[in-house]
């Protein structure tokens, strides 16, 4: 029973990234994170760029690929209970504008980070591993796949 709900979606998680202004808010949040990290004294610019990239990718991995279910009481009989937010997004349709945006954003951030760290080997390895950790779960071939049973339930 959905008394008092105002949305018409069976699962509001499916359309949240298509909301008005969400992409701009997302980019501004990344910029704000970067500015906050830049304001920490005695931290160099390459370290700040790497921290921005690592924090962004860690947050993206946790919120899109680890957390399952919905924060709402949905009438879908628990179908979304075992799906991550990435799998619920756009009803599972691949290659939508929102999915492309969320795939391209860490890549652009990776390029910026690599440039501003001057391709330092340690920063480069950390940023590459971080990028792969958020890009690989986004592949269509891994939709619904739980590697080694991790995050199965």
UniProtKB/Swiss-Prot annotation:
Instruction: Classify the protein's membrane topology as the record does.
Output: Multi-pass membrane protein
Q: Which residues carry this modification: Hydroxyproline?
A: 137
Keyword terms? Endoplasmic reticulum, Hydroxylation, Membrane, Transmembrane, Transmembrane helix, Ubl conjugation
Query: Record's Pfam families?
Result: ORMDL
Spans within the Extracellular topological domain: 118-121
Q: Which domain of life is it from?
A: Eukaryota
Q: Quote the PTM field.
A: When hydroxylated at Pro-137, ubiquitinated via 'Lys-48'-linkage, leading to proteasomal degradation. In endothelial cells, ORMDL3 proteasomal degradation is controlled by the sphingosine 1-phosphate receptor signaling pathway.
Q: Cytoplasmic side of the membrane: what ranges?
A: 1-21, 64-94, 143-153
Q: Where in the cell is it found?
A: Endoplasmic reticulum membrane
Q: Which GO terms describe its biological process?
A: ceramide metabolic process; intracellular sphingolipid homeostasis; regulation of ceramide biosynthetic process; sphingolipid biosynthetic process
Annotated membrane-spanning segments are: 22-42, 43-63, 95-117, 122-142
Task: Give GO cellular component annotations, separated by semicolons.
Answer: endoplasmic reticulum; endoplasmic reticulum membrane; serine palmitoyltransferase complex
Region Important for ceramide level-sensing, residue ranges: 1-17
Share what the entry says about its subunit structure, partners included.
Answer: Ceramide-sensitive subunit of the serine palmitoyltransferase (SPT) complex, which is also composed of SPTLC1, SPTLC2/3 and SPTSSA/B.
Q: What does this protein do?
A: Plays an essential role in the homeostatic regulation of sphingolipid de novo biosynthesis by modulating the activity of the serine palmitoyltransferase (SPT) in response to ceramide levels. When complexed to SPT, the binding of ceramides to its N-terminus stabilizes a conformation that block SPT substrate entry, hence preventing SPT catalytic activity. Through this mechanism, maintains ceramide levels at sufficient concentrations for the production of complex sphingolipids, but which prevents the accumulation of ceramides to levels that trigger apoptosis.
Q: Show the domain comment.
A: Ceramides bind to ORMDL3 N-terminus and stabilize it in a conformation that physically restricts the accessibility of the substrates to their binding sites in the serine palmitoyltransferase (SPT) complex, hence inhibiting SPT catalytic activity. In the absence of ceramides, the N-terminus is flexible and permits substrate binding, thus liberating SPT from inhibition.
Spell out the family assignment given in the record's similarity comment. Answer: Belongs to the ORM family.
| Official protein name in the record | ORM1-like protein 3
